[in-house]
């Protein structure tokens, strides 16, 4: 392949799962190359799995290797602004990521998703529904399996979640459709400001046949003229129609499915489902054959996931909500006929939680505050009660629960005061839900 004609020495920067997938892919598809790895960590994860023919420089940079490289493949966790990478770029040596290598190698249709919130759910559900429609599907990227590993099995369609970091080093990814879900402040330690962050996200449209964008968030629209389809909370294009007590998902005026037929929780997940319909249609998949999969989809673990539904009480694990924006998204358009018992708290990371107050005011709410920074939530609602642990909360409220109520963990905080990570916190909630439901 002509892309590789003048490339002899490749340096992979950053090991871990992604770095290993790059090394494996290069050795399999371009065995003529000399591949070396640099990782600034003393004990990089995956070092023991590196083939012995591949040299590893650990604990710092190797500027000589970088100077001799014809191509540098960098990990998304390493900023392009890093001085050593800037030196490589100044010399004119191409710096790419694993997604760019995927773009060079893939020969089947690809759809991709980016956004500040919701992209993992959209990616996963797109894959689930495409499989239900009879396709062989490779799902990965920023979620689950690295993109290059997906190429090891043949597929009819690839569905990729792409972060802004991955998009920075991607320039030739051809897509049947690309979705930009929303934009909210994140990763400001990496970007100069919101404009830079948005510009990285917009790169997803560079070689896309169709842009799927959010009518309710103008920041998601491409800056260039290209075919666009929109999703949103009104009745246009992919939208929502309220008819009495029911809400319908619409595809250009046609009712597809009613929200009360879905196991997914929250209005933001209706928007996510609309994006999936748009992506499937753009990829030539008849989603009507997969509506049962949509009905039965409960969401990704720890993301608005129904973990118990007993005696009319739903227990929802949204432990992935480690910031205010995620909790606000989860609470918007919640359909609960009874009282919402909302569990919040943990490590607040210095955040100001007052933006939650107006949303709390609209809910039939019992606010249950726990963990290190639980006190920060106490002034936000008159119902707030302080607990020490999540188990204390559930022991106390379990006897009060009635049919129509919902118990939801959406803490708006990190977990490491009482748990190893948000997954462990969510698992603990799920166990308690099964015990007390």
Swiss-Prot record:
Any coiled-coil regions, as ranges: none
Residues the record lists as binding ATP: 115-121
Annotated keywords: ATP-binding, Cell cycle, Cell division, Cell shape, Cell wall biogenesis/degradation, Cytoplasm, Ligase, Nucleotide-binding, Peptidoglycan synthesis
Cellular component annotations (GO), alphabetically ordered: cytoplasm
Pfam families per the UniProt record, alphabetical: Mur_ligase_C, Mur_ligase_M, MurD-like_N
Chief location category: cytoplasm
Catalytic activity: UDP-N-acetyl-alpha-D-muramoyl-L-alanine + D-glutamate + ATP = UDP-N-acetyl-alpha-D-muramoyl-L-alanyl-D-glutamate + ADP + phosphate + H(+)
NCBIfam families: murD
Function in brief: Cell wall formation. Catalyzes the addition of glutamate to the nucleotide precursor UDP-N-acetylmuramoyl-L-alanine (UMA).
Name of this protein: UDP-N-acetylmuramoylalanine--D-glutamate ligase
Organism: Vibrio parahaemolyticus serotype O3:K6 (strain RIMD 2210633)
Gene, per the UniProt record: murD
């Amino acid at each position: 392949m002509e892309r590789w004609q003048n490339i002899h020495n490749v340096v992979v920067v950053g090991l871990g799962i992604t770095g290993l997938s790059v090394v494996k892919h290069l050795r399999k598809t371009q065995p003529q190359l000399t591949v070396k790895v640099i990782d600034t960590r003393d004990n990089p994860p995956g070092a023991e799995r590196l083939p012995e023919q591949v040299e590893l420089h650990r604990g710092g940079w190797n500027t000589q290797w970088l100077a001799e490289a014809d191509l540098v493949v960098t990990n998304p966790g390493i900023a392009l602004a890093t001085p050593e990478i800037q030196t490589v770029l100044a010399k004119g040596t191409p710096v790419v990521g694993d997604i760019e290598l995927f773009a060079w190698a893939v020969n089947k249709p690809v759809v991709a998703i980016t956004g500040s919130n919701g992209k993992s759910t959209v990616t996963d559900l797109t894959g689930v529904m495409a499989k239900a429609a009879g396709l062989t599907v490779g799902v990965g990227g920023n979620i689950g399996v690295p993109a290059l590993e997906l190429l090891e099995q043949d597929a009819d369609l690839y569905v990729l979640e792409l972060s802004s970091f991955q998009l920075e080093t991607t320039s030739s990814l051809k897509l049947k459709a690309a979705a930009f879900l929303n934009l909210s402040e994140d990763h400001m330690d990496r970007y100069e400001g919101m404009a830079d962050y948005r510009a990285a996200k917009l790169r997803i449209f560079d070689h896309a046949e169709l842009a799927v964008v959010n009518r309710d968030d103008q920041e998601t629209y491409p800056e260039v003229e290209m075919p666009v389809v929109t999703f949103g909370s009104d009745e246009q294009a992919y939208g929502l129609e309220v008819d009495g007590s029911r809400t319908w998902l619409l595809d250009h005026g046609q009712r597809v499915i009613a929200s009360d037929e879905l196991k997914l929780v929250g209005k933001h997940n209706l928007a996510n489902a609309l994006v999936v319909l748009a992506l499937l249609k753009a990829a030539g998949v008849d989603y009507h054959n997969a509506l049962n999969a949509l009905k039965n989809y409960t969401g990704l673990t720890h993301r608005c996931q129904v973990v118990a539904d007993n005696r009319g009480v739903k227990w929802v694990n949204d432990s992935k909500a480690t910031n205010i924006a995620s909790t606000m998204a989860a609470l918007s358009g919640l359909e609960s006929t009874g009282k919402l018992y909302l569990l919040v708290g943990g490590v607040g990371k210095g955040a100001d939680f007052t933006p939650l107050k107006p949303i709390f005011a609209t809910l039939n709410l019992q606010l249950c505050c726990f963990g290190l920074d639980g006190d920060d939530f106490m002034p936000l609602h008159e119902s707030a009660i302080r607990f020490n642990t999540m188990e204390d909360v559930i022991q106390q409220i379990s006897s009060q629960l009635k049919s129509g109520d919902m118990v939801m963990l959406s803490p708006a905080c990190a977990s490491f005061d009482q748990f190893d990570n948000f997954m462990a916190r969510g698992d603990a909630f799920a166990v308690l839900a099964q015990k007390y439901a």
